Every structure is written in C-alpha cells, then in structure tokens.
C-alpha cells in the first residue's frame, strides 16, 4: 500500500512503513 499523508491512514494501510 502507498503511504498516505495522514499518519493514521498510513499506519492502518501500510503498517506505518513509510
């Protein structure tokens, strides 16, 4: 999953792997 600007969304969809 791509990293979102929103850290919460990034964590949910990308396991905070930005």
Swiss-Prot record:
One of its GO terms (molecular function) is toxin activity. Expressed by the venom gland. InterPro entries: Insecticidal_knottin-like_sf (IPR053718), Toxin_28 (IPR012633). Keywords: Disulfide bond, Secreted, Toxin. It is found in: Secreted. The keyword Disulfide bond applies. One of its GO terms (cellular component) is extracellular region. The keyword 4Fe-4S does not apply. The presence of a 'disulfide through disulfide knot' structurally defines this protein as a knottin. Belongs to the neurotoxin 16 (SFI) family. Insecticidal toxin. Causes flaccid paralysis followed by death when injected into Heliothis virescens larvae. Does not induce any toxic effects when injected intravenously into adult mice at a dose of 1.1 mg/kg body weight. This is Mu-segestritoxin-Sf1i. It comes from Segestria florentina.
């Amino acid at each position: 999953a791509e990293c979102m600007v929103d850290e919460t969304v990034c964590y949910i969809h990308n396991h905070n792997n930005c």
